[in-house]
Amino acid sequence: GSEMCIRDRRMLEWLKKTDAETHLVISPWAAATILHETGYTMKDVEKLASFTYSHKDQAARISSGSFQTDGMIVAPCSMKTLAGIRTGMADNLLTRSADVMLKERKKLVLLTRETPLNQIHLENMLELTKMGAVILPPMPAFYNHPQNLTEMVEHIVFRTLDQFGIHLSEAKRWEGMKQEK
């Protein structure tokens, strides 16, 4: 949904502030969703990334195990993409790059998009977790008392970036429950 498009754009914006090198692959459905739900153009999103690739470009450097990276975030991760990654169906650059992360034992974080979940979804998530992937459903948190949608979205962004050792000072962390006197 639109919160995912907003979240993913915010993630790229925060990564740009850290000077991290980012490589962006946008599926055709993601491109259509971005335009439909946010009004952003592909150029708006692509300019936030260091490099962008067509999902068809399986010869891109990120499709190789020799490409040096800290890992990969798939956001949003549809159940179709999740199933493709789990089964090694590397039929596009997105699933191929995720396959490379698994074979090279690199960090692979999947921000799954679906509710409710059926048994197939859960089994795919379990098997990918066993393979080393991190399933990070973008669920809102309320312990940080978000005041608006942006704060809810950024909580997920910060939790995702934490997986890569990118700890931003703007992130609100759990500090325990305040005891009433």
Which residue stretches match the model-derived regions?
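Histidine-anchored nucleotide/phosphate-binding helix
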Residues: R7-K17, L93-M101
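Short, hinge-like loop/turn segments at secondary-structure boundaries
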Residues: G39-D44, D70, L126-T129, V153-H155
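Glycine-rich phosphate/pyrophosphate-binding loop and the adjoining helix
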Residues: V134, P138-K181
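Helix-loop-strand module that forms the ligand-binding subsite of alpha/beta enzymes
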Residues: F51, Q58-E123, L128
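N-terminal beta-loop-helix "entrance" segment that forms/cooperates
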Residues: V25-L48
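Short, small-residue-biased leader/transition segments that mark boundaries at the very start
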Residues: G1-I6
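Short internal beta-strands
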Residues: A20-W29, L110-T112, P137
